[in-house]
Amino acid sequence: MSAASTLAVRHAPWSDGWFDDVLTIEQSVYSHPWTPGNFRDSVAAGYHLDLLLVQDQGQERVAGYLVAMEGVEEVHLLNITVAPAWQGHGLGTRLLNALCVWSRQRQAQWLWLEVRASNTHAQQVYQHFGFKRVGERKHYYPLAPGRREDAVVMSLLLRAPRPASGSTA
């Protein structure tokens, strides 16, 4: 693996050719990973899927990805994942930066996400990026059979709200 400053990295849109690699990463990172159907449904629904590819030992590999859903003046980040071998190289921040650019191009005012209450590292990353904790969803994530975990809801203001029509501001 290369040092972060010398990584050859590029963003790519979703391609079914990377499907198995994405599933392998998803299953290696999460105790309750997305299913193949979750990814297929996201593609079919037209959600934004961004792959982050790296050059590693002469081969291009998936290092991370995200899935986001566009709404009215907002984007909801549904899944962001960096492969364990590539964590700690700033790739999650790179994915978030690209998502902010994409969201602003669509005139989104807000970026929303949920994160497991126990995932304090991710919460710190999001806070450092500028996200604010705005609430929680009780019993949102599955745990062991019959148990659930709360989600922390976070949001990032991407642009100032538009003045209401007829406003003199």
Segments from the language model and where they lie:
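Residues at secondary-structure transition points
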Residues: P13, G90, R94, A117, ...
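Conserved catalytic-core motifs of GNAT/GCN5-like acyltransferases
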Residues: E114, Q127, K132-D150
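Conserved glycine-rich acetyl-CoA-binding loop
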Residues: A83-N97, Q105-R106, W110, R116-Q124, ...
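Short Asp/Glu-rich motifs
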Residues: A45-G46, A122, P145-G146
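Acetyl-CoA-dependent GNAT
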Residues: A3-A4, R10-H89, T93-W102, R106, ...
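Positions that flank functional sites
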Residues: D41, S118, Y141
